[in-house]
Amino acid sequence: MKFRTINEANVSGKRVLVRVDFNVPMSQGKVCDNTRLERHKETICALQKRGAKIILLSHCSRPRGKIVPELSLRPVAKALETIMGQQIFFVEECIGAPVQTAVEALQEGQILLLENLRFYKEEEDNNADFAEALAQQGDLYVNDAFSVSHRAHASVEAITHYLPSYAGMALQRELQALEKGLDNPKKPVTAIVGGAKVSSKLFVLNHLVTKVDYLVIGGGMANNFLMAQGHNVGKSLCEPMLMDMVKDVIEKARESHCTLVLPVDAVVGLQCETGTPHHHCMIEAIPDEGMILDIGEHSIARINTVIDASATLVWNGPLGVFEVSPFDHGTIAVARYAAARSQKGHCVSIAGGGDTVFALNHAGVADDFTYLSTAGGAFLEWMEGKTLPGVLALMQDLKN
């Protein structure tokens, strides 16, 4: 995967449009979590040191082409001032005369943040005219947002047709980490895929069985595989209408010599809530009225044995109903074991997706994985083997 990076760009005195992801939680006009702002600091500082005039582009939430005052990026500008230690200029537009005036006034090293891109319907339509209008404000373009690179949007894809385009440092670091996960990994490779519904990850599973040596399936989605193997799963979450597709994954795994690792025991209760009575049982003994809420100790031990045999681990999704104690135990136990292996240098560990990040933070080991991606949809599409539009655009720009 080859594309130009900002290290190759002459940015001195240039207007540099930087696509960032400042889609952050806000409450009462203030940013609640600066994590995503911090991720882009390295790229912004690198451009500053080399004399660039920096114009930041971002979306926030889903205003669907309408101006929604509570989704304005003005509070983000204030939060960014604290992080950067300098004034951040802000314009309540993305294109037009006010933006042009603000850009013309920028000095080298100064930063301008434009308004929420998704206040414009044309952004999500990948509209060429809107992309060209954005491009007129800059001399070159930098994509620093892996988390939006699965979107063929105007500020991600179409804009690259109008400006020389480069990868920022956060994007470059993410792609390098992911390459170690599935594209060019050390073997054996294990993928852990969990979550509630198998319907949301069938494409991921179909791709992974052709790429990994072991595929661990947990969470509610594992119930479908257990049912496909003839097990009773009681009242557990399941999607019977997808049974043929699940059986196809099982067959494809067999043909690809990928070992499927499914729960062999479980923690079972009658309801999915804190304080509900629960007990341990083997998969063969799930009661008709029971719900599988977490993996059991035998399953944890089996997964840890697979991790012991792995040089690369890719993880997306929890292994039980981790939001409800004590059904977070399986996810926490495996996460801590994987983190310890990674810290000792025994495996490269890569995890991603919103629930996964939350779960690993909950387990206290998020910082112990080799790489943790905050991207949700982009991470899943990478796991599906798709080439992301934002990354493809940078690769094509290099060819041109």
Swiss-Prot record:
Amino acids binding substrate: D21, F22, N23, R36, H59, C60, S61, R62, R118, R151
InterPro entries to which the protein is assigned, alphabetical: Phosphoglycerate_kinase (IPR001576), Phosphoglycerate_kinase_CS (IPR015911), Phosphoglycerate_kinase_N (IPR015824), Phosphoglycerate_kinase_sf (IPR036043)
GO molecular function: ADP binding; ATP binding; phosphoglycerate kinase activity
Protein origin, superkingdom: Bacteria
Principal subcellular localisation of the protein: cytoplasm
Family membership: Belongs to the phosphoglycerate kinase family.
Binding-site positions, ATP: K201, E323, G353, G354, D355, T356
Pathway recorded for this protein: Carbohydrate degradation; glycolysis; pyruvate from D-glyceraldehyde 3-phosphate: step 2/5
Keywords, alphabetical: ATP-binding, Cytoplasm, Glycolysis, Kinase, Nucleotide-binding, Transferase
GO terms of biological process kind: gluconeogenesis; glycolytic process
Taxonomic classification: Bacteria, Pseudomonadati, Pseudomonadota, Alphaproteobacteria, Hyphomicrobiales
Keyword Transferase applies: yes
Catalytic activity: (2R)-3-phosphoglycerate + ATP = (2R)-3-phospho-glyceroyl phosphate + ADP
SUPFAM superfamilies in the cross-refs: Phosphoglycerate kinase
Annotated gene: pgk
Keyword hit for Kinase: yes
Uppermost EC category: transferase
Identification of the protein by name: Phosphoglycerate kinase
Record GO cellular component, one term: cytosol
Subunit details: Monomer.
EC number: 2.7.2.3
Species per Swiss-Prot/TrEMBL record: Bartonella bacilliformis (strain ATCC 35685 / KC583 / Herrer 020/F12,63)
Matching Pfam families: PGK
